[in-house]
């Protein structure tokens, strides 16, 4: 998945989890629990992590504030797309 510069800064400088708000594109098919690649605005791989949502869910959630996840999907697996404890920065 591709993330914006704000998400890059939050992950690299603050050690933050990846929130749906920072996702700008979802590519490929994956299910909840799969390890996915996180790419920055220029396409460079920044991290890998275990995703809490599948590709179809994240396609709907990209750019959405965490407090709106349940409104968009009708359910939720938490406020983050990938928790910092489930992520490795490269």
Language-model-derived ranges and their functions:
Residues 1-90:
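Beta-strand/loop-dominated core regions that host nucleotide or nucleotide-derived cofactor-binding catalytic loops
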């Amino acid at each position: 998945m591709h993330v914006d510069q704000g998400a890059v800064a939050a992950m690299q400088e603050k050690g933050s989890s990846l929130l749906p708000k920072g996702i700008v594109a979802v590519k490929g098919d994956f299910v909840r629990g799969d390890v996915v690649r996180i790419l920055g605005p220029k396409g460079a791989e920044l991290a890998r992590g275990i995703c809490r949502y599948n590709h179809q869910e994240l396609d709907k959630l990209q750019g959405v504030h965490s407090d709106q996840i349940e409104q968009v999907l009708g359910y939720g697996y938490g406020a983050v797309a990938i928790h910092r404890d489930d992520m490795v920065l490269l």
